[in-house]
Amino acid sequence: MSDSPGTPNGKDTIRNYEFTPIGYVKERETSVPAVANSDSRKRSSPYRSPAADDDGPPQKAFRADDTLNSTRIFNDSSFDDTLPSQSVMNSVRINGVSDLHDNGIEEENGGASNPLKEQQETLYKLNVENYNLRVKCNSLLKFLNNVTDEGELRKNLAVIDELQEWKGKYQELKKAYRSLQLKFDQSEHKDQADLEQDARSNEKEMRSLQKKLQEYQEQVTQSKKLVESLENKLGNSASGSKEIKEQFEHKSSLLQERIDKLESELAAKDKELEINRNEIKNLQNDLQKANHDSSSLADQKLQTRSKEIENLNNRLKSAVREREAAEHLLKESQNALRSLRAELSTLRQESDRKLDDLSVAKEKSERVLKERLEERTSQSERLQQRANSLEQNAAELSSRLQLRDQRIKALEDEARELQKMNQRIQDLNDGKDSEKLQAQNQKLDGLRSEIERIKNEKEELERDNDKLKKRIVAQATKSPALKANSRKSLEKDAEAEKLRSRVRELEQELRVSKDALNKLRHNYRRDTDELKLQLEGAETDQVSAKRSLEKEIDRLKFEIDSLRESRKDEIAIMENRFNLLRRENEQLSGQGGSQLASLQKSLTEKQKEINELVQRCSDNTMDRLKLNRELAKAQEAESEGKREASKLSARLEFITKEFVKYKEAKTQGGEAGADRLNEKWSEKYQHMKQRLLNELKVLQEENLELERATLERKGSAGSGTYNVGMSSLQDQLDYYRLKYHREVAHTNDLNVMNDYLNRVLRASAQHVRLDILKLENEAPPDAFPEFTYRGRLRFKTVALFVLAAVRVQRVSLKLRWDSQRLNYLQKKIALEQDKITW
């Protein structure tokens, strides 16, 4: 028999406690103390009470309570819906029951007295009481350590008493729970075979379902292949849209005629049905009359009426067959309409593709025209700039020519003066200073040669100017064609550079001539001073000198006037050419505007054609919708007619069966029984007749309402305008699909939350059980050493927290996008429904 547990503060008795300290690892014992009761077994359950073992309080190796850092509940793996195996649960409960039996709790009403057993029980009770007293002492010590000197000791003692009372109640409840657990384990032994059978049947069902899934997957793949082949066929049959459209119109007209014929036939059949119903009513009336006549006459009439009923049944069967034929025709028409719808969809796709091609071609043509206009405007601007630059160059050249003319005139005046002076010197000196005169004559010849050279350069510049003007005119005439503009611009730039270099050379030559003139002036002044000294006394021949000088002046004036007139003509020619260039530029801009106008007209025409095509497409869709509605209504009418015919045939068969039964009963029974049966069947017949009449009235009223509705529909078919498009249907489909996916996701989230809360509740219940066991077998707080790793965050917790934050952010973004999409689709559908004019 085991010793009683020692004091709670003893470090050497920790191994006898139920719970090991947190973080404390038990050392393996080499020798186990002898146990008095060798037959008793230890419980396999982790939750053991003091009454479970004879070795003292039960023991349990417990892990460190890391509830703060533990993320086992929040892992994805914890959301596993699999239940624990039944064998484990049964083993736990069975062991519990066997332990209860071994411990002797259920053996109160045993057989003969056993002194050893009684001693064991008394010792066990004493151990339990001792343990409870120690727990109380420990709890009292805790409370006393925590109590202040403010008079709270009595309150704490009262709380301790209440705790003890509740512990006693808990022990009683625990005993009741154990008894119930025993009963439950006994009942579960019986149910285990049933559970195994259920598991086998479930496995069989799973296998069959997997086979069905494989079959469905194969069917899906086959259907996908069929869809792909059909799509390929549809893509191949896209050619010949106009012929298909004409065929569709022809087929639709034929189908409309066939539908009209079927409606007329249905109306005729309805009339025949009404006639048959009237005949049935008449027959029923005759049957009522025949009931009052003699039995023989009734039999004969019944036979005749039964034959008539059979004839009517045959007629009804023929009518049903005709209905079936009409339904077959309707199905064929529906199939034809479906094929026509497919052709319409292909036509619509082709029209959309053509519209896209037209829009692309229109955009390309607009881009090309814009680029051409921009090129022409840029070329006209360049030509204008070049014309302006050429005008400036011409003005500069004219100003330079005027300056040169003035210089030439001055040089000519100086030459005349020198000639006069030479003549005077010749007259006065007659041979004096011949060397000086020769030098002056040489200088005069040099000046004349320079003047001639300058005149030649002027003529060359004028020729270059004329050439430039001709080139400008040629370029202006060739500008509409826009040929080799870059090359001509380069040539013009090169020519302009040549002209500039030529102007620079002329300016340099002018500078040289200016220097020479300055030198000549200096020499002239020096010579004039010398000549003045020589001509102080020479005053003869002044009249002749004056005349010669006047002649020279008149000649020079004439030359100057001729030069001015020639320049005026050149300026007028330049102005005319400039005006011509301006007019040609205006003509080019006008041609560009006319081309733009023509392009805009062509664009408007194409836009009209596109609008017409769109209108045709919308009309085709409207016709298709009308045909669909009419077909649906015709199908509904056909189905209603079928139902009515089936009901009537069933009722007629029932009536014939009743008549047959009536005949048999009449032949078998006597007259009294026959009278009773006649009364019974007459009442039944009247009741059925009334029901049939009521139903016939209801059906007639429904037929009249349907006919009125069809007539109103036919009358209002031409007046109504529908602007329903496939886009609204697509938007509605997208809206409801998105809403459905959102609801499915919401339900999945709710299921996950529910599972999570269930698992949290289970875990919390498990923690509560563990806390209760701790309170029952309370250990001192000083028995557990302090561990440094307690309360420390782990990398796994931080990583899971970050992952959860990322998932929450993604889900919130997706929800926001879905809500925005739903709002947009809802507004769009509302706007499109507002646009519909019924």
From Swiss-Prot:
Family: Belongs to the SPC110 family.
Name used for this protein in its record: Spindle pole body component 110
Subunit record text: Homodimer.
Key words of the record: Coiled coil, Cytoplasm, Cytoskeleton, Nucleus
Sections of the chain in a coiled coil: 163-644, 682-709
This protein's encoding gene: SPC110
Chain's role: Component of the spindle pole body (SPB) required for the proper execution of spindle pole body (SPB) duplication. Potential role in cross-linking filaments or anchoring other molecules. It is essential for growth.
InterPro entries from the UniProt entry: Spc110_C
Polar residues bias spans: 287-303
Cellular localization per UniProt: Nucleus; Cytoplasm, Cytoskeleton, Microtubule organizing center, Spindle pole body
Principal subcellular localisation of the protein: nucleus
Pfam families: Spc110_C (PF18520)
An example Gene Ontology CC term for this record: spindle pole body
Region Disordered, residue ranges: 1-67, 187-209, 287-310
